[in-house]
């Protein structure tokens, strides 16, 4: 399984919001509002297509929960099969993940830290690691 191991604040700047979990004053998004890459291209950007906007929102959700594409696709397939609005079902499934629950309860500062707490075995569910 491959996961993103590059600079986390680069993704914050790329998607225009704090995704890395750092405090707002320490995140790269607050220091530099421009997206990463060539600076001369900033004034020449066109309006993104509908597909580009949908892809950007999907990637933003993926990086917010720090999951890989295959996991995200499986969550989407499960959400579509459930009755109701598939987008709401998808967000509900993502919120039910153990690392997100630990993050929401305040046991960790970031979702990455919550994943590390789980993988190191500090959290057990029904006496199972």
Name what the model sees in each region.
Residues 101-104, 109, 116-117:
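Extracellular-facing segments of soluble proteins and assemblies that are Gly/Ser/Thr-biased and enriched
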Residues 111-129:
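A contiguous pocket-lining binding segment that forms or flanks enzyme active sites
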Residues 1-105, 129:
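Ferredoxin-like alpha/beta domains used as RNA- or RNAP-binding modules
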